[in-house]
From Swiss-Prot:
Keyword Methyltransferase: no
Ligand binding (anthranilate 2): R171
Name the record gives this protein: Anthranilate phosphoribosyltransferase
Gene name as annotated: trpD
Quaternary structure, from the entry: Homodimer.
Cofactor binding description: Binds 2 magnesium ions per monomer.
GO BP field: L-tryptophan biosynthetic process
Purpose of the protein: Catalyzes the transfer of the phosphoribosyl group of 5-phosphorylribose-1-pyrophosphate (PRPP) to anthranilate to yield N-(5'-phosphoribosyl)-anthranilate (PRA).
Amino acid sequence: MPSAPTWPALITTLIEGRHLSVSESTWAMRQVMRGEATPAQLGGLLVALRASGETVDEIVGFRDAVLEDALPLDADPRALDIVGTGGDPYGAVLNISSAASIVAASTGVPVIKHGNRGASSASGASDVLTALGIDLTIAPERVAAVLRETGITYAHAALFHPGFRHAAATRRELGISTLFNVLGPLCNPARPEASAVGVADLSRVPLMVGVFRTRGATALVYRGDDGIDKLTTTGHSHIWEVSRGAVTEHDLDPLELGIPRAPIEALLGEGVEENAEVIRRVLAGEPGPQRDVVLLNAAAGLEAFDLMGDPTRVQQPMARRLREKVTVAAEAVDSGRAAAKLEEWAAATRA
């Protein structure tokens, strides 16, 4: 009978170049979520994993423990999450996923966004949504009600995963991308069946794809060639399409969609309030590179949702599918529905 895991044994396993099993990973994350791991133990785990490179089994084990500990979110899982890992080399990319989520919801697709405050970036989803008037302090049951009333809601990680607070200081002090950047997009407590997920670190794409594939989930996983966890407009992006256990890879040039190239500087923000103001302007219909990148990423979410209902869509060229979805997203913005959706959502969280 194998002996019970210990922190020295697990960290030694990693620094010797070996990997943790699913059960060992689950044990370690349970310790973290319960506050039973010391900052030194957690820091050692995060750094050792970062150095050795996480495996799908390790991420599955960590994810299982996080969801086991999560507060329930009673919502129809036939919904969409648009999210990114963060951890890009710039540290100041606009909150594109948050804006894209609002646009997607304004087209009629139910959106359950999951996120947290910034740890490895200047402005996390929770930060910018607060600045946009979304009340993150509502009770978990109210979060589900807001989805039913408005078609969009936000699962604030600090609310639904209270155990994450035990890792916050260590993550902040390390200041690097860690396994938590990978876990975030995988731990939505509502378990939505469609996901559009940006991954900044190319080495971690197989992890994200592998977990979605193992779950039998539907997802578009993507990364800009400029290193951002978004479909970019500065150049090409790579997309990994996961459907029914199969993975199809695509290369995307925004020019194929009629979207002009933009300098990376146009996609960077200066802070929470500034990012919120950019989102307001985009939702109000202001043209420019910020609008273009939001529409592109909203299109990815819309395509992931449609793929969930019709897996045969994988047979069509990705550029054609996304071009159609960009048109849908643009119409939602230009009609005023996207801006109205933000106001409706904010009001519902304050009701």
